[in-house]
């Protein structure tokens, strides 16, 4: 009761809890509870605000540290100093600092960069140069910023983020070091933190603030120099080893050696007992009856199985001489049949041990040379021989081994000649081909000089089959050529000697000229089949590297042949036909796309690193110089791009008819295109590309540019390998001239002049480039050209036709077409070739023999708007100054809208159908039509090759 008299908080709680009907009677106590709950809620909200403020402060601190890091890194790279962060941001907005950084690591951009801007657009020009540098170095798109982010200051943290990523990327390329870490080393004022938090909060709401901590982890995962370093304490702990461990290890080694020696003795005794059964079996087989002989043969098979089971045990023996002893025991005092069954598995087991000790080969050579080679077949040594060439052995050991190989070849030829119905040509030639290819790679010239003639003579004396010998020998030669090209080596001097030994050993039975003619065509076919198989692996370069192989091959095959004056023309045409067939097959093969590798500390690229004109065209399109000149853009793309060349593979440019006549169909036109492409594209890549078309055609180059261009022409191997000797040799004229770039400009003006037919002024060239060869054709253009032709009919008279002898001849032979011919002015002949020559040139794929004497004449009017072609029954001499049908097709592409046909028989209409689709424009032809046309073209090509004259 005394406790209840003193009223306290506990007593109030008890009384309220004991109140009837659950009604609280003390109201001030309820207010206390409510106030306490509100107080706790306020405390939690205050704590959350404090935590958020601290997190925002730390985030702002990290951002400001990253800004200071970028500022310090740029100061070290550009040698500039900034007092405050505001000055640093103003310098970034100006863009000059970023442009200096781009010029430092991309000097090629600095040589080509010429500012043409107003005062208001200065910062955008600087930023464009910086963006070109980012494209060149391969910056990832998530790390890049836009111009408005920096110029209008929408997102400056994104710019700092890009600078950090650039530093890490340059560090990955081993050019500079990345930004230094200043986190925790700087002291920043509260006012700076508040301003930074406001900027960050706005960007976070828009989800545009970059994540700086993840940047370092991203680049460190891709970095090849990221290594985990161990501390010195851990290394010292590993080096210190207790003394009792060494004693335990020595005891274990002793126990294992004693155990191995005991096992080795047991195995050796067991093997000697089993090997002793072989001579006993052979003696019993020769002395007993037939029934007992069958029983002993079954026992011998069981013994042989037990011996094969011992081969696995041989692999685990520490001494390799035991396997050689086993091989020697099997060959001594035993028949050839048993030794031929036992030796191959033994040699297969030896191969596993050769990688550890190549000196075992000396033991093998000495053992088999002492035992004799008569008992062993050559085929058992094929795996060992191929394995041998992979080791580095002294020259004396290699000579002894090669002598053993040649003796084995001689013995195998003698054995095959003694046996009836036994053909070893396939196995021997396949084995010899592998040996020859490896021998060429090892440069074994003395080996070929000493032994090859004897082997080939004996082989031809014993085997008289023509087809197998020639086909196998061709396979040998093709494997030699492919192996040489695979190892990036020149074709050896022994190749003509091999051909002479193979094909001129039987000069008594066959004529040398017939054999030689068969060699050439068959060798070309075999070589191209082999190249088509190995193409995806070994042809990693561009199209010009394909011609180097053909050039080396032709020099080695025909360079040393001495010919008389009478047969010189025949050999020249024959060589040309072979080169044409080779290059035609090479052109149709697909080239893999090469990813350029950027090397060097300054990250500067030359024409050897990048030979892609698509980048140049993209560069021109960005500047807007060639947007109004589509044909000039198409001209460059036709010359340099191998992808676009597939569409126009039957077309070449119009060249001068006096000096640069091409007497071939597709291959030489391909080489002339590459000749022109080098003369056009190398100055563009080397930095001579001007800002406008007027400066490209008529700009005056400096002396430094001329010297640089001359050094490129002298040192570049691509130009020397591509230019054939039959053409005029533009590369030599460029190198010898004092002003090569001006010569290049004049050549470009001539090409454009051939398109236009006008004077060399800028206005006419611009008119031609804009309207003369446009890819878009409309009905209005056709109607206008037709009206223009109608006006020409009134002005021209019959005298103009009779002045030209060709037109007068046409008038006499073809009176029906006079009404149409007299109205047009045919200034010169585009083509005048016989149908037989067109068939040989593979321009016409199916043509009857009755039309071979007729001549196809093609004429064009002055304005290049109408084309007429017809046949003449006359076999006059052909003027070499006339251009080809491929040039005609290119002329059709440049602006001819009509095709007419006069006096053509019914079965020659496929010539018209073959010409007409090419004269159309690419926009009118669908993709399926191109596919079908390509199939028909390939089928015609195969039929033309199979047909003989």
From Swiss-Prot:
Presence of keyword Nucleus: yes
Family matches, as SUPFAM superfamilies: Calponin-homology domain, CH-domain
GO molecular function, one term: calcium ion binding
Single Gene Ontology BP annotation: ascospore-type prospore membrane formation
Entry GO terms, CC: nucleus; prospore membrane; prospore membrane spindle pole body attachment site
Protein source organism: Schizosaccharomyces pombe (strain 972 / ATCC 24843) (Fission yeast)
Keywords on record: Nucleus
Subcellular location: Nucleus
Domain Calponin-homology (CH): 64-170
This protein's name: Uncharacterized protein C17D1.07c
């Amino acid at each position: 009761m005394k406790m209840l008299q003193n009223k306290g908080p506990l007593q109030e709680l008890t009384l309220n809890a004991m109140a009837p009907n659950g009604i609280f009677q003390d109201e001030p106590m309820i207010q206390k509870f409510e106030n306490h709950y509100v107080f706790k809620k306020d405390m939690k909200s205050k704590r959350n605000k404090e935590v958020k403020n601290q997190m925002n402060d730390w985030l702002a601190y990290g951002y400001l540290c990253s800004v200071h890091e970028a500022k310090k890194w740029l100061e070290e790279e550009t040698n500039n100093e900034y007092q405050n962060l505001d000055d640093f941001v103003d310098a970034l907005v100006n863009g000059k600092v970023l442009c200096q950084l781009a010029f430092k690591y991309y000097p090629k951009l600095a040589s080509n960069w010429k500012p043409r801007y107003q005062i208001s657009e200065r910062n955008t020009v600087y930023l464009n140069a910086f963006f070109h540098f980012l494209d060149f170095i391969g910056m990832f798109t998530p790390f890049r910023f836009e111009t408005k982010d920096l110029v209008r200051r929408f997102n400056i943290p994104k710019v700092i983020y890009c600078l950090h990523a650039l530093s890490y990327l340059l560090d990955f390329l081993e050019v500079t070091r990345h930004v230094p870490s200043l986190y925790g080393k700087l002291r920043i004022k509260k006012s700076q933190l508040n301003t930074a938090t406001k900027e960050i909060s706005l960007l976070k709401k828009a989800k545009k603030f970059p994540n700086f901590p993840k940047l370092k982890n991203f680049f460190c995962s891709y970095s090849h120099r990221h290594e985990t370093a161990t501390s010195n304490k851990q290394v010292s702990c590993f080096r210190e080893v207790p003394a009792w461990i060494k004693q335990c290890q020595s005891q274990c080694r002793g126990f294992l050696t004693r155990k191995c020696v005991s096992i080795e003795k047991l195995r050796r005794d067991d093997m000697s007992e089993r090997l002793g059964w072989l001579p006993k079996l052979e003696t019993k087989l020769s002395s007993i009856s037939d029934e007992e002989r069958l029983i002993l043969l079954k026992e011998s098979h069981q013994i042989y199985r037990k011996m094969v089971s011992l081969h696995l045990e041989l692999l685990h023996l520490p001494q390799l001489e035991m396997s050689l002893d086993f091989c020697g025991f099997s060959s001594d005092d035993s028949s050839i049949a048993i030794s031929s069954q036992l030796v191959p598995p033994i040699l297969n087991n030896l191969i596993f041990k050769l990688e550890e000790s190549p000196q075992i080969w000396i033991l093998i050579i000495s053992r088999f040379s002492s035992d004799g080679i008569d008992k062993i077949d050559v085929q058992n040594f094929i795996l060992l021989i191929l394995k041998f060439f992979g080791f580095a052995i002294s020259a004396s050991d290699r000579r002894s081994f090669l002598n053993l190989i040649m003796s084995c070849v001689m013995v195998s030829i003698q054995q095959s000649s003694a046996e009836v119905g036994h053909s070893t040509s396939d196995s021997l030639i396949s084995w010899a081909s592998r040996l020859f290819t490896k021998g060429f790679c090892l440069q074994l010239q003395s080996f070929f000089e000493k032994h090859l003639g004897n082997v080939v003579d004996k082989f031809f004396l014993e085997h008289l089959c023509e087809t197998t010998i020639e086909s196998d020998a061709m396979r040998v030669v093709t494997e030699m050529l492919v192996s040489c090209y695979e190892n990036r080596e020149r074709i050896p001097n022994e190749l003509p000697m091999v051909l002479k030994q193979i094909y001129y050993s039987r000069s008594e039975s066959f004529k040398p000229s017939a054999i030689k003619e068969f060699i050439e065509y068959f060798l070309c076919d075999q070589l191209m089949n082999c190249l088509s198989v190995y193409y995806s692996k070994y042809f990693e370069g561009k199209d010009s590297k394909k011609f180097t192989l053909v050039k080396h091959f032709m020099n080695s095959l025909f360079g040393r042949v001495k010919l008389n004056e009478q047969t010189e023309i025949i050999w020249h045409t024959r060589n040309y036909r072979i080169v044409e067939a080779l290059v035609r097959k090479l052109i149709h093969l697909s080239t893999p796309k090469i990813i350029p590798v950027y090397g060097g500390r300054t990250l500067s690229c030359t024409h050897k690193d990048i030979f892609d004109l698509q980048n140049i065209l993209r560069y021109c399109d960005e500047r807007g110089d060639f947007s109004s000149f589509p044909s000039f853009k198409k001209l460059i793309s036709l010359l340099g791009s191998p992808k676009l060349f597939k569409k126009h593979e039957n077309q070449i440019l119009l060249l001068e008819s006096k000096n640069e006549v091409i007497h071939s169909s597709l291959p030489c036109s391909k080489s002339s295109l590459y000749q022109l492409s080098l003369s056009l594209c190398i100055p563009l890549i080397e930095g001579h590309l001007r800002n406008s078309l007027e400066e490209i055609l008529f700009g005056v180059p400096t002396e430094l540019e001329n010297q640089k261009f001359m050094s490129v022409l002298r040192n570049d191997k691509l130009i020397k390998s591509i230019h054939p000797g039959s053409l005029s040799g533009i590369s030599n004229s460029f190198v010898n001239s004092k002003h090569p770039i001006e010569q290049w400009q004049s050549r470009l003006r001539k090409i454009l002049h051939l398109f236009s037919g006008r004077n060399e002024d800028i206005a006419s060239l611009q008119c031609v480039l804009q309207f003369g060869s446009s890819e878009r054709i409309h009905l209005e253009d056709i109607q206008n050209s037709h009206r223009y032709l109608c006006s020409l009919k009134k002005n021209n008279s019959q005298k103009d036709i009779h002045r030209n002898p060709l037109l007068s001849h046409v008038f006499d032979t073809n009176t029906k077409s006079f009404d149409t011919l007299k109205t047009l002015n045919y200034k010169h002949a585009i083509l005048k070739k016989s149908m037989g020559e067109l068939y040989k040139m593979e321009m016409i794929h199916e043509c009857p023999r009755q039309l071979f004497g007729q001549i196809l004449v093609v004429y064009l009017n002055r304005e290049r708007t109408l084309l007429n072609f017809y046949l003449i029954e006359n076999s006059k001499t052909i003027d070499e100054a006339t251009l080809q049908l491929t040039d005609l097709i290119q002329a059709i592409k440049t602006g001819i809208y009509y095709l007419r046909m006069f006096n053509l028989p019914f079965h020659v209409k496929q010539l018209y159908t073959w010409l007409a689709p090419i004269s159309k424009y690419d926009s009118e032809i669908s993709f399926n039509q191109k596919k079908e046309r390509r199939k028909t073209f390939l089928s015609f090509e195969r039929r033309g090759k199979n047909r003989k004259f």
